């Protein structure tokens, strides 16, 4: 049963107020300030304006957001579900408050019909079937906002910053219904996108290129939301220079050992994006690395894949590829290492700024055979346009 629009809006208003009070309380607890980068030699090279920007990424504020988004109230954020709809409204409210421009077909939303998507996946010809048109639409939404660039020559090129905001929802078992809250997977990525959007939007001087902040529905159903965007891009693919997708950055208890101040990149050496993030890590004290197995293995397992298939140099960053509560009921918000999460998000912020302010765009590695299909897609897109 779905909430009526008015009831949903009222519920969201009340919950947003409650959440912001909670976030403020977390930030003020024990007079804790937002984390700052330690004054190392490498950190000293960060421009003051950029340093001020990344210092706005607060562990305590992110704790407040995540404790709501991964709460039982959102019922595990299945696609589609009431909880997912509520989260979409919440993300849009954060984008609006940050001052991002709405660029979807419905404000901050890129809307799709879940029933049509399901029919098309079962039968590619079903989308043209008259019977499909008689099924009532079931709306699902990517949430998207943009920070326009400042350079007249580069502002019409785009850097994507993404995460998925869905999870597994409620599932039945022999012991009753269980809620899968998905704090690390991927409320951590969603909150990171919100934090990055807020930080960049507060900059006194915007980056040269435009930065698009987007959260996808349906990743757990097979990268559905990101594939929908790839097929229906809001911004020209040939003008989209890179994508950084944020997935599972909250937990440090990887099954291979603790991953503190560590950030892995999928397809690390497929393009120059991995090296750009690694360079950012030198300034923040975060080890950015290629996992010998999982870097390549998981390149196709998250939403970056749908963008890479279009030729965009897009990669996913993660702290823990595998952790004890992965796709389990124990993936709760109180198991997140928020200070570490803020530190890695600052690293991502520096990488985004580097790409957004560089006249040159990241390239696929033509010498790497694993990148060949993506390079071919990029070349084909340039030829067509």
Model regions and ranges:
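Alpha-helical metal-binding/catalytic segments enriched in His/Glu/Asp
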Residues: 145, 157, 161-222, 348
